Amino acid sequence: MEATKQVVNFGPGPAKLPHSVLLEIQKQLLDYRGLGISVLEMSHRSSDFAKIIGNTENLVRELLAVPNNYKVIFVQGGGSGQFSAVPLNLIGLKAGRSADYVVTGAWSAKAAEEAKKFGTVNIVHPKLGSYTKIPDPSTWNLNPDASYVYFCANETVHGVEFDFVPDVKGAVLVCDMSSNFLSRPVDVSKFGVIFAGAQKNVGSAGVTVVIVRDDLLGFSLRECPSVLDYKVQAGNNSLYNTPPCFSIYVMGMVLEWIKNNGGAAAMEKLSSIKSQMIYEIIDNSQGFYVCPVERQNRSRMNIPFRIGNAKGDEALEKRFLDKAVELNMISLKGHRSVGGIRASLYNAVTTEDVEKLAAFMKNFLEMHQL
């Protein structure tokens, strides 16, 4: 039976899944394609699951035009697991065991902190007072002896997004794309490693996709756990340990949906339309809504803002959130570390969903503006 309550989910991840995908999952849940069992109980060694994981990998390759000299693996541990896996696999590429990190928000800061356990970390720019911009790349102090350069393409907490691929002078470039993966086309050949948790743009929680260039396999530190070792996972076709089968299946279905809806280029177009709708209201509100991020670095995925003034009027913000829930719009509360409001507009969030939020924001503004 279809759920009767229609809620718009602006959650930062886990996030909204396409309705058609949810219905298909529901339909196949008890009996997957006439096999008489659910994917939830299917052996990861079966030929049926081999087709599922093969299909998911092929769709990643097709949608991002992944070159043949890259492996695509599906692992557990989330983005946070990759904060350890990246240095464990790559920091030993050069004798000095050092890495360059660009820190533009909470997630790249966590990644840099984790990497310090395994080698020397160089933050390539002076520490930012607040996470509201991307430091000018011409000022970055890259270490030519670094094993890799790391950045986070989109910071979900602070709403800061790279709209360019940094030029790192031929160094191995590593990117956390968890929150804007497949929201736009990407030239994979510019990267050594790309990783992304599925639970924002491409599926449900539990699986992380890692795209790694072949020549970077086999350099893991001696102390690298086998489950985090890219060479081990790639050599076992992501079946070294029991993978998150159901999450891989859901991801495959979401990728199919993205493909059927025009691919990464169409997602990019939609993301610009959706985010623009909200930023316009913020910018035309005469300071009632305030987004702290510098315009050129604003995220299409996560829009953080305060209400009333730059520091936020907590009573107004509470009223905004309560009223939104009454109107069946959920998960608009900002991250606990920054407060305020945050609207996450991932691939499955429709323009109609965003129009509903935009209309509410206009209405709320009119009711409370002096």
UniProtKB/Swiss-Prot annotation:
<feature type="binding site" description="in other chain">
    <location>
        <position position="241"/>
    </location>
    <ligand>
        <name>pyridoxal 5'-phosphate</name>
    </ligand>
</feature>
<feature type="modified residue" description="N6-acetyllysine">
    <location>
        <position position="51"/>
    </location>
</feature>
<keyword id="KW-0007">Acetylation</keyword>
<dbReference type="InterPro" id="IPR015422">
    <property type="entry name" value="PyrdxlP-dep_Trfase_small"/>
</dbReference>
<feature type="binding site">
    <location>
        <position position="79"/>
    </location>
    <ligand>
        <name>pyridoxal 5'-phosphate</name>
    </ligand>
</feature>
<feature type="binding site">
    <location>
        <position position="335"/>
    </location>
    <ligand>
        <name>O-phospho-L-serine</name>
    </ligand>
</feature>
<protein>
    <recommendedName>
        <fullName>Phosphoserine aminotransferase</fullName>
        <ecNumber>2.6.1.52</ecNumber>
    </recommendedName>
</protein>
<keyword id="KW-0597">Phosphoprotein</keyword>
<feature type="modified residue" description="Phosphoserine">
    <location>
        <position position="331"/>
    </location>
</feature>
<comment type="similarity">
    <text>Belongs to the class-V pyridoxal-phosphate-dependent aminotransferase family. SerC subfamily.</text>
</comment>
<comment type="pathway">
    <text>Amino-acid biosynthesis; L-serine biosynthesis; L-serine from 3-phospho-D-glycerate: step 2/3.</text>
</comment>
<dbReference type="InterPro" id="IPR020578">
    <property type="entry name" value="Aminotrans_V_PyrdxlP_BS"/>
</dbReference>
<feature type="binding site">
    <location>
        <position position="336"/>
    </location>
    <ligand>
        <name>O-phospho-L-serine</name>
    </ligand>
</feature>
<feature type="modified residue" description="N-acetylmethionine">
    <location>
        <position position="1"/>
    </location>
</feature>
<feature type="binding site">
    <location>
        <position position="199"/>
    </location>
    <ligand>
        <name>pyridoxal 5'-phosphate</name>
    </ligand>
</feature>
<dbReference type="InterPro" id="IPR022278">
    <property type="entry name" value="Pser_aminoTfrase"/>
</dbReference>
<keyword id="KW-0663">Pyridoxal phosphate</keyword>
<feature type="modified residue" description="N6-(pyridoxal phosphate)lysine">
    <location>
        <position position="200"/>
    </location>
</feature>
<keyword id="KW-0028">Amino-acid biosynthesis</keyword>
<dbReference type="GO" id="GO:0004648">
    <property type="term" value="F:O-phospho-L-serine:2-oxoglutarate aminotransferase activity"/>
</dbReference>
<dbReference type="InterPro" id="IPR000192">
    <property type="entry name" value="Aminotrans_V_dom"/>
</dbReference>
<comment type="subunit">
    <text>Homodimer.</text>
</comment>
<feature type="binding site">
    <location>
        <position position="342"/>
    </location>
    <ligand>
        <name>O-phospho-L-serine</name>
    </ligand>
</feature>
<dbReference type="InterPro" id="IPR015421">
    <property type="entry name" value="PyrdxlP-dep_Trfase_major"/>
</dbReference>
<keyword id="KW-0718">Serine biosynthesis</keyword>
<dbReference type="GO" id="GO:0006564">
    <property type="term" value="P:L-serine biosynthetic process"/>
</dbReference>
<feature type="modified residue" description="N6-acetyllysine">
    <location>
        <position position="318"/>
    </location>
</feature>
<dbReference type="InterPro" id="IPR015424">
    <property type="entry name" value="PyrdxlP-dep_Trfase"/>
</dbReference>
<feature type="binding site">
    <location>
        <position position="176"/>
    </location>
    <ligand>
        <name>pyridoxal 5'-phosphate</name>
    </ligand>
</feature>
<feature type="binding site">
    <location>
        <position position="156"/>
    </location>
    <ligand>
        <name>pyridoxal 5'-phosphate</name>
    </ligand>
</feature>
<feature type="binding site" description="in other chain">
    <location>
        <position position="44"/>
    </location>
    <ligand>
        <name>O-phospho-L-serine</name>
    </ligand>
</feature>
<feature type="modified residue" description="N6-acetyllysine">
    <location>
        <position position="323"/>
    </location>
</feature>
<dbReference type="GO" id="GO:0005829">
    <property type="term" value="C:cytosol"/>
</dbReference>
<keyword id="KW-0032">Aminotransferase</keyword>
<feature type="modified residue" description="N6-acetyllysine">
    <location>
        <position position="127"/>
    </location>
</feature>
<feature type="binding site" description="in other chain">
    <location>
        <position position="45"/>
    </location>
    <ligand>
        <name>O-phospho-L-serine</name>
    </ligand>
</feature>
<dbReference type="Pfam" id="PF00266">
    <property type="entry name" value="Aminotran_5"/>
</dbReference>
<feature type="binding site" description="in other chain">
    <location>
        <position position="242"/>
    </location>
    <ligand>
        <name>pyridoxal 5'-phosphate</name>
    </ligand>
</feature>
<feature type="modified residue" description="N6-acetyllysine">
    <location>
        <position position="333"/>
    </location>
</feature>
<comment type="function">
    <text>Involved in L-serine biosynthesis via the phosphorylated pathway, a three-step pathway converting the glycolytic intermediate 3-phospho-D-glycerate into L-serine. Catalyzes the second step, that is the pyridoxal 5'-phosphate-dependent transamination of 3-phosphohydroxypyruvate and L-glutamate to O-phosphoserine (OPS) and alpha-ketoglutarate.</text>
</comment>
<feature type="binding site">
    <location>
        <position position="107"/>
    </location>
    <ligand>
        <name>pyridoxal 5'-phosphate</name>
    </ligand>
</feature>
<keyword id="KW-0808">Transferase</keyword>
